[in-house]
């Protein structure tokens, strides 16, 4: 194997859900491994959670054994994981992987994470009068302590330092969460960090994108069916059975998990109590899970593709073509040759 070359760029592989990123990443790691060891950094907000294997399409133990993987199974579903934490972890891992003489390969579909890594993290969002009006209306009906309880679910760090009646600060924290999807505490962590700690990170970006959207839609449907057959419902039932999780948590808002949780809630309301772990979901509920889960996943894929198309510097491979993986591998090798001594 060639000696490590620090001039080689970090490689990023992005794409919509069900585009075949995991298989492509493993093939790419095998090809690159002939010249330099490769380690994969996951860029996926669902894969960070333990106990969420089926619905997140988590790489199998065999796949993770074939190539070192990072940022998988690093959080309990009760915990949040922000874009700021991802950037901090990814930058640290890139340095550690480089120090081992290996090449970082960042793979995933959480575009907020990629954006934060490539561009640096945005400043805290500005106030939104419409969001504030909705929060004020809820507070008038439920009281600020109720909204403080909600804040504790999505941003426990901020909630812990605020009194239940601190309406102004509770409103701002929930406003930031609703606008950005990130807890207020994550922005404070950025502001307190060392200069440049969360700046942009240079990567050569490659993407897998379908030429035919119907091809991806069909793959999404088939994969969701495979998840259901593999025990996805039981996986969510086991998470519910813990008793400390709820649907407002970031982990439980992941596509697929939200739809299964909602179906189980519906069955609990209409069938005399919550289903026990392993109990079958009624046919009506199963139909709803499939319909809503597939639709939500397709919407996610649409948003991912829209984000990718805003990145003109990417190298795109058509993932719905027969030789897609081989073409991707060749494109990455050519890019690395440009940096070879």
UniProtKB/Swiss-Prot annotation:
Top EC group: transferase
EC number: 2.5.1.75
Cofactor list: Mg(2+)
Sequence positions that bind ATP: 15-22
UniProt similarity note: Belongs to the IPP transferase family.
SUPFAM superfamilies, per database record: P-loop containing nucleoside triphosphate hydrolases
Subunit: Monomer.
Protein function: Catalyzes the transfer of a dimethylallyl group onto the adenine at position 37 in tRNAs that read codons beginning with uridine, leading to the formation of N6-(dimethylallyl)adenosine (i(6)A).
Record site: Interaction with substrate tRNA: 110, 132
Name under which the protein is recorded: tRNA dimethylallyltransferase
Stretches for region Interaction with substrate tRNA: 44-47, 168-172, 253-258, 302-309
Keywords, in A-Z order: ATP-binding, Magnesium, Nucleotide-binding, Transferase, tRNA processing
Catalysed reactions listed for this entry: adenosine(37) in tRNA + dimethylallyl diphosphate = N(6)-dimethylallyladenosine(37) in tRNA + diphosphate
